[in-house]
């Protein structure tokens, strides 16, 4: 093993069983948990994000859960800063950071770093969110293609958070996000843990998922139905009662929340909301698989196996990550 301290990434698609395995690992290894999930950062968004229960969190604390109000944005850059601080604190106590979740952009930000982009501008962002509401995301994507075609080619037209951020960077700085990244890459050769540097840890990357994709789809449908039974609609209704929340915010655009919001807006029937929520979650899982297929040195585990804890411990022992 190198001189860098160890860290463990436990990745995988939604509904794969990441949290359960992570908790089992903390019972036998000197690990502390860090959540890697863009929905779990928001307070008051518990049911639709499949947030661990209060009892579970009390027994097995996760850092970076409930750290933002739904009216606030939370970027990959902010996550990287927060996660690096949490990892350093855990390491200083002689423990191992165990990062668990499915927001693959956050993992990539940790591993590869991020270009040093201009900070968020609340006024510019509000104006862009208003445009998105009034004109639609297709128009924002067209605007981005005019000023930053490279970013437009990378960002899906239905990804409001990344579209708005790319346009925000251009409007605030006068330079495209692509130009910022290219300059940062040229300047940051040899950097370590800065915004554009690499992660100063030796990482064991694990991914868990059912080998049968049909099983994952069944799990997704079952979990969405369970969320509805647990009061998901009422949770979103409470969010809608706040005057500072709207459908253009990153929190409300989260999978599941946007479909229930549209249902409460009268845009969808209950059956349509359920169907679209399940489809959107399956699409999220597909994107997560796409990220993971391109991930180097990842060790796969089958969600359906009954001995994943022992398999994980055997793998970690084989690569001497904790020695």
From Swiss-Prot:
Q: Domain of life here?
A: Bacteria
Q: Which residues bind ATP?
A: 12-19
Q: Which reaction equation describes what this protein catalyses? A: adenosine(37) in tRNA + dimethylallyl diphosphate = N(6)-dimethylallyladenosine(37) in tRNA + diphosphate
Residues with site note (Interaction with substrate tRNA): 103, 125
Keyword Magnesium tagged: yes
Q: Which GO terms describe its biological process?
A: tRNA modification
Enzyme Commission no = 2.5.1.75
- Please list the cofactors this protein needs: Mg(2+)
Region named Interaction with substrate tRNA: 37-40, 161-165
Q: What class of enzyme is it?
A: transferase
Note the InterPro entries from the entry.
Dimethylallyltransferase, IPT, P-loop_NTPase
**Where is substrate annotated to bind?**
14-19
Single GO molecular function: tRNA dimethylallyltransferase activity
**Signal peptide per UniProt:** none
Identify the keywords attached in UniProt to this record, alphabetized: ATP-binding, Magnesium, Nucleotide-binding, Transferase, tRNA processing
Q: What does this protein do?
A: Catalyzes the transfer of a dimethylallyl group onto the adenine at position 37 in tRNAs that read codons beginning with uridine, leading to the formation of N6-(dimethylallyl)adenosine (i(6)A).
Q: Which family does it belong to?
A: Belongs to the IPP transferase family.
The family database entries (NCBIfam families) matched by this protein are listed as: miaA (TIGR00174)
Q: How does it assemble?
A: Monomer.
Indicate what this protein is called per its UniProt record: tRNA dimethylallyltransferase
Q: Which organism is it from?
A: Pseudomonas putida (strain W619)
């Amino acid at each position: 093993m190198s001189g860098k301290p160890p860290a463990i990434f436990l990745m995988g698609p939604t509904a794969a069983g990441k949290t359960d395995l992570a908790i089992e690992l903390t019972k036998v290894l000197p690990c502390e948990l860090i959540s890697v999930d863009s929905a779990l950062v928001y307070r008051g968004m518990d049911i639709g994000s499949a947030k661990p229960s209060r009892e579970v969190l009390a027994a097995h604390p996760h850092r970076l859960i409930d750290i933002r109000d739904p009216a606030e944005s939370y970027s990959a850059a902010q996550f990287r800063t927060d996660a690096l601080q949490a990892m350093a604190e855990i390491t200083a106590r002689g423990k191992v950071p165990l990062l668990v979740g499915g927001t693959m952009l956050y993992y990539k930000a940790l591993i590869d770093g991020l270009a040093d982009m201009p900070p968020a501008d609340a006024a510019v962002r509000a104006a862009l969110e208003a445009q998105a509401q009034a004109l639609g995301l297709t128009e924002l994507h067209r605007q981005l293609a005019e000023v930053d075609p490279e970013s437009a080619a990378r960002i899906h037209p239905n990804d409001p958070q990344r579209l708005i951020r790319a346009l925000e960077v251009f409007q605030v700085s006068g330079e495209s996000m692509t130009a910022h990244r290219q300059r940062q890459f040229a300047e940051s050769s040899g950097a370590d843990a800065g915004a554009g540097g690499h992660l100063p840890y030796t990482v064991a990357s694990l991914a868990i998922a059912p080998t049968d994709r049909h099983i994952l789809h069944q799990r997704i449908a079952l979990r969405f139905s369970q969320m509805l039974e647990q009061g998901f609609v009422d949770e979103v209704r409470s969010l809608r009662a706040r005057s500072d929340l709207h459908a253009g915010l990153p929190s409300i655009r989260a999978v599941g929340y946007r479909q229930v919001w549209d249902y409460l807006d009268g845009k969808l029937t209950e059956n349509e909301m359920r169907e679209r929520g399940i489809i959107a979650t399956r699409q999220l899982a597909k994107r997560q698989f796409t990220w993971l297929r391109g991930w180097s040195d990842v060790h796969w585990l089958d969600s359906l196996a009954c001995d994943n804890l022992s398999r994980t411990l055997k793998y970690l022992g084989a690569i001497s990550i904790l020695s």
